[in-house]
Amino acid sequence: MNKQRGTFSEVSLAQDPKRQQRKPKDNKSSISGTKQEIFQVELNLQNPSLNHQGIDQIYDCQGLLPPPEKLTAEVLGIICIVLMATVLKTVVLIPFLEQNNSFPNTRTQKVRHCGHCPEEWITYSNSCYYIGKEKRTWAESLLACTSKNSSLLSIDNEEEMKFLTAISPSTWTGVFRDSSHHPWVTINGLTFKHEIKDSDHAEYNCAMLHLDRLKSVQCGSSKRYYCKHKL
């Protein structure tokens, strides 16, 4: 449009020379301004890439960013992993830890109730228990417990038996007999009335706790032992 104005001005001046002579300064200024406008328009038309370059850079920068759908999917994936880990911990790990800690918890409760056992002794109910660090014969175990002001293990009830078996599956007890023709007695001289397996063997005259039952074995064999001291 500016180009048309400039052309129209030039034609008008050519047709009216008298008018051109009356105002020479104004026409010269108008022509100069028109030429500048035409040059600016032509420059813009010749270099359209300059205007689009900035726009392309903006779109290129935006293309570097992940779309909102991708970000949402990644966040949901992380949340799912965290939830699965929490469920596995609740279902598997916590019951496992509770099961493994059931006996230590029982001992802790008993210690709080009594709390008078020497160091390295286990407290359960109203008694203290010492676990021998080495295997000994029945007679040697009896002497070792006597030196600790205690007696070789005696079992009062089934609950105590289960508790001790969970700590050590095999140990001497303070039950014996003189021969297969004599009854089983405790070290205190009391008749032992509970069943003892394999009591028909003539040489098996000492009783031990094995798993959840009592069985007769040779008194000269080496076994682990418990010392017991009642509070």
Swiss-Prot record:
Residues 94-231 are extracellular. Residues 16-28 have a biased composition (Basic and acidic residues). The chain crosses the membrane at residues 71-93. Pfam families: Lectin_C. Residues 1-31 are annotated as: Disordered. Gene3D superfamilies: Mannose-Binding Protein A, subunit A, YojJ-like. It is found in: Cell membrane. PANTHER family: C-TYPE LECTIN PROTEINS (PTHR22800), NKG2-C TYPE II INTEGRAL MEMBRANE PROTEIN (PTHR22800:SF247). This is NKG2-C type II integral membrane protein. The lineage of its organism: Eukaryota, Metazoa, Chordata, Craniata, Vertebrata.
